[in-house]
Each structure stands twice: as C-alpha cells, then as structure tokens.
A protein has these predicted regions:
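Conserved glycine-rich cofactor-binding loop
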Residues: 14-15
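Conserved glycine-rich Rossmann-like NAD(P)H-binding loop of the short-chain dehydrogenase/reductase
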Residues: 28-43
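A short, exposed helix-loop element centered on a Lys and neighboring polar residues
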Residues: 124-125
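Substrate-binding pocket helix/loop in short-chain dehydrogenase/reductase
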Residues: 94-110
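Active-site loop of short-chain dehydrogenase/reductase
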Residues: 5-6, 77-81, 131-144
Length: 164
C-alpha cells in the first residue's frame, strides 16, 4: 500500500450504494479495501487503486473477525483514513412481508441486528488503531427508516438502524 495516499474500508461494496461509494473514493485517488458476501465485480479488479476485496459474511462474527485481520494485514501498519459501514439487510418473512414485531422468526431479528448493528460495532473496534493513526472517520450508513416510520421497512430493520 502507498502510505502517501488515503485509504478507506467500504462494506457492502459489490453493488448499490456501497459500490458507488467505493467508485467515488476510487475516482478521487483513494486506495480502497472492500468487503461483501459476493466477490467484487470484475471491473473493480482492473482499477489499480482497488487494493483488495475480501469476501465476507458480515452476519457471521467469525467472518467479520477474519475480515478485520486480513484488512489490517493489507494496511501493513499504514493508517486508515475512513471506515464506511454501509452493509445492511431488511429481510422479508416467508410470506413476503417485511420483518416486524408480530411476524417472522425471532432468529431473523438476531440476524438483522448482527449485520446492521453488531458488525459495524466490531469493525469500528477492529480498525480503531489504524483509524487513530490516520486521524480517520467512521461513517455509519443508516436509513431514513431509522428516524421516521417508513412503509417499506420492517421493524427489525428500522430499529437496528436506529440503534446504529
């Protein structure tokens, strides 16, 4: 890694907001380290600033810990300037309803909180040293559903984003 250029970690970067966020940092010359459940899109591998992508299940605490270890290895003692906790989930029940207080399996609530709340907490702690070295910032991507009732967000998602 080039310690002269700034470095960012972006979660949930294989598509959507996370992918576009990663592209924005790339366009500005930052080195990026990303993770998502899926492999990075092939066009990302062609960009020399895309330092590494680590397939990670942020809903699994062991996988999160592995990502922290591997990403810190990629940093090689260099500072981290930003952590973008973007990954999130809003599952539906088997009946295609958003997971709410009165429907769905309670284990699904655990899964939502593991990914939407505990993973960002673990990542923030896991990168605290590198962030301090780079005087970095943590950005937790939440949702309007965490602040206001939203018809397309279930209770589990909304409450987990409020907690974050």
């Amino acid at each position: 890694m080039n310690e002269q250029r700034k470095t960012v970690v972006v979660t949930g970067a294989s598509r959507g907001i996370g992918h576009q966020t990663a592209r924005l940092f790339l366009d500005r010359g930052w080195q990026i380290i990303t993770c998502s459940r899926e492999e990075a899109p092939t066009e990302c591998g062609r960009d020399t600033n895309w330092t590494c992508h680590i397939a990670t299940d942020l809903g699994d605490s062991d996988s999160v810990q592995n990502f922290i270890v591997e990403a810190n290895k990629a940093l090689d003692g260099n500072p981290l300037h930003a952590l973008i906790n973007n990954a999130g989930m809003s599952p539906k029940t088997p009946y295609k309803e958003r997971l709410g207080c009165l429907n769905g399996n309670l284990d699904a609530w655990h899964d939502v909180f593991e990914l939407n709340f505990f993973a960002p907490l673990r990542l923030s702690r896991g990168f605290a040293g590198a962030l301090a070295k780079g005087k970095g910032a943590i950005v937790n991507v939440t949702s309007i559903a965490g602040h206001k009732i939203h018809p397309f967000a279930g209770s589990a998602y909304s409450i987990s984003k409020t907690a974050l």
